[in-house]
Amino acid sequence: MKTSQFLSLLLLAGIAQAIVPPREPRPPTGGGNKLLTYKECVPRATISPRSTSLAWINSDEDGQYISQSDDGALILQNIVTNTNKTLVAADKVPKGYYDYWFKPDLSAVLWATNYTKQYRHSYFANYFILDIEKGSLTPLAQDQAGDIQYAQWSPMDNSIAYVRGNDLYIWNNGKTKRITENGGPDIFNGVPDWVYEEEIFGDRFALWFSPDGEYLAYLRFNETGVPTYTIPYYKNKQKIAPAYPRELEIRYPKVSAKNPTVQFHLLNIASSQETTIPVTAFPENDLVIGEVAWLSSGHDSVAYRAFNRVQDREKIVSVKVESKESKVIRERDGTDGWIDNLLSMSYIGDVNGKEYYVDISDASGWAHIYLYPVDGGKEIALTTGEWEVVAILKVDTMKKLIYFTSTKYHSTTRHVYSVSYDTKVMTPLVNDKEAAYYTASFSAKGGYYILSYQGPNVPYQELYSTKDSKKPLKTITSNDALLEKLKEYKLPKVSFFEIKLPSGETLNVKQRLPPNFNPHKKYPVLFTPYGGPGAQEVSQAWNSLDFKSYITSDPELEYVTWTVDNRGTGYKGRKFRSAVAKRLGFLEPQDQVFAAKELLKNRWADKDHIGIWGWSYGGFLTAKTLETDSGVFTFGISTAPVSDFRLYDSMYTERYMKTVELNADGCDDNVHFQNAAVLSNTLMNGGVTADKLTTQWFTDSDHGIRYDMDSTYQYKQLAKMVYDQKQRRPERPPMHQWSKRVLAALFGERAEE
């Protein structure tokens, strides 16, 4: 619910015909002579666009949202009329709050305070309820101690569902009812365990109110028997490290290990009656529940998306709430690859006398929008073609329109469209005849939207009415200051193109050339892939002026960078994605090597200084690319890599590689190690010399390497590495004074073989 604190000032700009100046369909190159510096680019870009994010309020008046004034008060504003009303005075706002959520009728606010991070999305907090009319602040639980995991308002009444100690509670008008009694270290009610949070939901909750607020669907996870993994924290955020590191034990299922089991439950809010719904779509040990959605405007029907363990078979199961009867209303075999969990089911209601819900599927080979009957039956395709729907932005059941983003122009672009599920007519809301990257945020009733142009030029945001997508009502964010600032700089020259593989597929490439590029000079090159399944790095979104832009701009470095999206990456169709199924690390490095050979056809490319650097999956890809020993790459930097997918978590790995039993040949037989420390030891024991291997540990950092000053140190080290590599001369490799070859040169001694 966090919203912009400066939006109300921006709205004073008034009516705008169109963004000025108009954006060219290409990245900016600047207009001056200044070059980007290290401090401007790392550890994060300081020269960057601003954007506004709104949490729209569903009220009688469309276009309303909550903003915060300079003194901290919460203001109800209308983005169209600029009218505003103070809902919560500044002196009623809890100090140091982390987040807040308004009750649907705007009569109360739920505050989260005393935030303590848990995993990527989850956290612990205290929660308080502010009655706006009375001004009273009441704790959600009288004895709370910063230990509540999640809380959510009912959509219709005065109830709050919350989770504490992995048990589910319902609060209503000051009275609390404990729903479950079995929550504990291994049993989770209404919140996901670590692997479901990280790999399935991408969120911290596993409970869903019915639209009328009368029922609650929730999942229960049981981690009993799931192997544990211990994470040591050596400094543990202390100035002086403790004598013994703090050890965090989490249940971390690896490939072919036991997974958490999951159950589906329904709760009648009024009676507190809980019902366990048997899940028979797949056996308990072969079951993943990926999504839950209510398929009614009240509480008649709810559905869940069930996958088998390796996520290449899918069943949508509908549950009739009154009878508790379950029925498979849709199923799919995706054993040619995997089935992505897109979390895109949404009930739309009656269409020509039959109830439907909308969903995205790539069963045709391309991700498209379909209408599916609530009770099962033949689907209706709303979009088709050799392009993909990326996301559904809004379903407007009054106008019978679905708003979405797609790659219709090109896989690297995003344009906003609507499609009528009555007439199937598809309409662009933007100019879809040129390369651009858009998204949109729609008001609660769908009457207005903020259109966000995100690249390739300087981003901006405008407000539109859905009745007229040609003329903006207002400019929300112009980024005029950034436009002016960039005129002082000479920026890297960014371009996009495709290269064609011998097998016929094309790979998207993003190239950065130094600002003072001279085609008659030789330049070192750094490849910067991610390359993971379904991911995308090469897009027309704003080119962040980050570390990659710095090493391209610094006169002492002047690296050309190439980012190549290999086979397996996203938005180019199912066949392109699924090519890597059961063999991660096989095709991806081949594609990077092929791209490097294509690069070397340019006379300016220095064949003696071609590097590759990747993070996470990109770190894995870096190592696998060097492992090919192609003779093309001369150095690699692998950051936070997965090194052996048998040792990564089960729900990610098995989606793409299956289990060891199903894919014995798919395991990496070349390097066996638990983590990067073991890899380092393996390489040293394998005879790799000190001048060819450098390692650095960031012991207390998470995957993003953000603890304390770790990020600052990391980028200084990266800058030194690429500088040292540029200075390296293949005819005279650097040698330490103790090298036998140096001694031989100095004293005429014969160096030992």
From Swiss-Prot:
Catalytic residues, chain numbering: S616 (charge relay system), D668 (charge relay system), H703 (charge relay system)
Top-level division of the source organism's lineage: Eukaryota
Compartment(s) of residence: Secreted
GO cellular component: extracellular region; plasma membrane
Signal peptide limits: 1-18
Keywords: Aminopeptidase, Glycoprotein, Hydrolase, Protease, Secreted, Serine protease, Signal, Virulence
Stored Gene3D superfamilies: alpha/beta hydrolase, Dipeptidylpeptidase IV, N-terminal domain
Positions bearing carbohydrate: N84, N114, N222
Record's catalysed reaction(s): Release of an N-terminal dipeptide, Xaa-Yaa-|-Zaa-, from a polypeptide, preferentially when Yaa is Pro, provided Zaa is neither Pro nor hydroxyproline
EC number(s) from the headed UniProt entry: 3.4.14.5
Enzyme class: hydrolase
InterPro entries assigned: AB_hydrolase_fold, Pept_S9_AS, Peptidase_S9_cat, Peptidase_S9B_N, Serine_Prot_S9B/DPPIV
One example of a Gene Ontology biological process annotation: proteolysis
Entry GO MF terms: aminopeptidase activity; dipeptidyl-peptidase activity; serine-type endopeptidase activity
Similarity annotation: Belongs to the peptidase S9B family.
UniProt function note: Extracellular dipeptidyl-peptidase which removes N-terminal dipeptides sequentially from polypeptides having unsubstituted N-termini provided that the penultimate residue is proline. Contributes to pathogenicity.
The protein's name: Probable dipeptidyl peptidase 4
Organism for this UniProt entry: Trichophyton verrucosum (strain HKI 0517)
Lineage: Eukaryota, Fungi, Dikarya, Ascomycota, Pezizomycotina
